[in-house]
Regions:
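Flavin-dependent oxidoreductases
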Residues: 1-38, 181, 187
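Short acidic-glycine loop/turn motifs at beta-strand connectors
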Residues: 7, 36-40, 46-47, 110, ...
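A short, flexible beta-alpha/helix-coil linker loop
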Residues: 10, 56-59
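C-terminal catalytic lobe of FAD-dependent flavoproteins
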Residues: 27-28, 38-47, 58-163, 217
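Short, surface-exposed beta-strand/loop micro-motifs that present aromatic residues
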Residues: 31-35, 104-106, 196-197, 205
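Active-site-flanking beta-strand signature of metal-NTP-handling nucleotidyl enzymes
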Residues: 50-53
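Mid-to-C-terminal Rossmann-like scaffold of FAD/NAD(P)H-dependent oxidoreductases
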Residues: 91-95, 151-191
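Rieske [2Fe-2S] iron-sulfur-binding domain
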Residues: 195-290, 294
Length: 294
């Protein structure tokens, strides 16, 4: 999560800072702060902008986004009391490797020579630069001392406990198949909101647009079959297992899923849900070696 607040120009020296909380080793919320000079934006005369991020959690596993924004703003005001009313806020998604190092190199799960750069843990600028050097060397056959360090196929024994916990967390999310829906009736669904509706053995992701129209699709993530959750702040369907995300109409936005949620139709007069005939599409592949999108 990120919030942006104005501060009097020059009241805080130019900086980029972060704390050492959070991550796999510690449960403390992780925070990072930077200053954007007002003249760089052209929209804040007499002010600089304080950009503060933090309050991370795994994608699809926390429904209280507003609470995280509130906590982040409170943390900011406690340390920067000169900050004015919040101007902007947004949330994003990053990939966290279990051993805290990015995956840069030949993809061990591909049948073709595919090179990847992922698992940035929020440090995309740094890892992007490293990847530019390392991948160039790998492609031209030049030795690079970082190759083994960032090898996507590496096995890090010291991170085995984290790996086991993350996979146990993923397995636990399949219990969503046993839970009740978010609403008992479509009449309970407000405009601009989405909810999981249970009809027999089916889980449906239903969204009511601002004009009152209803849109439905399967709530089953096409990657490995978890039930997606509604993200009311970003108006998206988020998979709590491996971090796939879909827009309010079920169109894929972020992998590992590479296709949309299966369509469904609504018979509004009977409040019934009809899914296409045939079995649910098979999962797209094995569980990745390093789950844990946040």
């Amino acid at each position: 999560y990120v919030v942006v607040l104005p501060i009097p120009r020059g009241s805080v020296h130019p900086l980029l800072l972060w704390d050492t909380g959070g991550g796999h080793a510690r449960p403390d919320p992780y925070h990072y702060v930077r200053i954007v000079r007002g003249e760089a934006t052209g929209r804040s005369p007499g002010h600089d902008l304080l950009v503060v991020g933090g309050e991370d959690h795994k994608t699809g596993q926390d429904a209280d986004a507003e609470g995280h924004y509130d906590a982040l703003e409170a943390w900011t005001r406690e340390r920067f009391p000169v900050a004015g009313p919040a101007l902007h806020r947004w949330s994003g998604q990053i990939l966290e490797p279990v051993d805290a190092l990015a995956h840069i190199g030949l993809d061990p799960g591909s049948n073709h020579p595919v090179y990847v750069a992922t698992g940035d843990s929020g440090n995309g600028m740094t890892h992007g630069t490293i990847a530019g050097v390392l991948l160039t060397d790998l492609l031209v056959g030049r030795e690079n001392p970082w190759e083994r360090l960032y090898d996507p196929g590496r096995v890090t024994l010291g991170a085995s406990g984290v790996y086991a916990r993350e996979n146990a967390n993923v397995a636990g999310r399949y219990a969503d198949w046993l839970r009740k829906g978010d609403v008992a009736s479509l009449d309970d669904l407000a405009r601009g909101a989405g909810a999981i509706l249970v009809r027999g053995l089916r889980r449906l992701a239903v969204y009511r647009d601002l004009e009152g129209g209803l849109h439905a699709c399967s709530a089953v993530c096409p990657h490995l079959g978890c039930v997606v959750h509604w993200n009311g702040v970003e108006s998206s369907w988020d998979c709590p297992c491996h971090g796939s995300r879909f827009d309010e109409l079920g169109r894929v936005v972020n992998g590992p899923a590479n296709r949309d949620l299966a369509p469904a139709t609504l018979d509004e007069s009977a409040r019934a849900v009809v899914l296409p005939e045939g079995p649910i599409p098979a999962p797209e592949g094995p569980i990745p070696a390093n789950p844990g999108a946040t």
